[in-house]
């Protein structure tokens, strides 16, 4: 894909003009629904799981990094190392309205052991990916404390295969976590 095409695609996938967690949630649900026909086998089509190289898809998974890092990764076609063994993703949506950015940052730092999450701006930006069969679910989970003191648990996924296709990036943009 030519550099101009990549640049156009990157900006086309950016979530803009979203001001609340509810708006971002609706936007991401629509984006996920748009992707379903592209990643699910159609009627009368069989899907050989072994041939596809892994288990069935996990829906949208999120990577939390800063915007410049995401741009570099997108143009390079690879995920950043944000974990000792590759890329760490989660099913924590970027519109979780009852958890603060600081708490998300703490959870990511604890789960990944990545010193880069010491700065909250490292997790203020998200990239939503659809990796059918390309990630593994880890045995550990990320535990966060909500703004009301409730324990929230999110799954963690790993990808040691850091190359990705532009079509696997579904959306990216600023997170809409609780302010606090």
UniProtKB/Swiss-Prot annotation:
InterPro entries found in the cross-reference section: Glyco_hydro_41 (IPR006065)
Signal peptide (from-to): none
Record keyword Hydrolase present: yes
Record key words, sorted: Cytokinin biosynthesis, Glycosidase, Hydrolase, Plasmid
EC number(s) from the headed UniProt entry: 3.2.1.-
Enzyme class, UniProt record, top EC level: hydrolase
Free-text function comment from the UniProt entry: Hydrolyzes cytokinin glucosides thus liberating free cytokinins. Contributes to the root inducing activity.
Designated name of the protein: Cytokinin-beta-glucosidase
Organism: Rhizobium rhizogenes (Agrobacterium rhizogenes)
Classification of source organism: Bacteria, Pseudomonadati, Pseudomonadota, Alphaproteobacteria, Hyphomicrobiales
This protein's encoding gene: rolC
């Amino acid at each position: 894909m030519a550099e101009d095409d990549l640049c156009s695609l990157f900006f086309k996938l950016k979530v803009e003009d979203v001001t609340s967690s509810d708006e971002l949630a609706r936007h991401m649900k629509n984006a996920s629904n748009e992707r379903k026909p592209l990643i699910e086998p159609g009627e009368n089509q069989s899907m050989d799981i072994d041939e596809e190289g892994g288990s069935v898809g996990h829906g949208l998974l999120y990577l939390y990094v800063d915007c410049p890092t995401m741009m570099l990764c997108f143009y390079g076609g690879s995920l950043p190392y944000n974990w000792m063994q590759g890329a760490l993703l989660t099913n924590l949506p970027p519109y979780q309205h009852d958890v603060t950015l600081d708490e998300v940052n703490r959870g990511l730092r604890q789960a990944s052991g990545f010193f880069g999450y010491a700065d909250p701006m490292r997790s203020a930006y998200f990239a939503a990916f659809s990796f059918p069969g390309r990630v593994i679910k880890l045995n550990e989970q990320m535990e966060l404390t909500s703004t009301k003191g409730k324990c929230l648990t999110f799954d963690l996924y790993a990808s040691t295969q850091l190359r990705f296709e532009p079509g696997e990036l579904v959306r990216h943009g600023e997170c809409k976590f609780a302010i606090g």
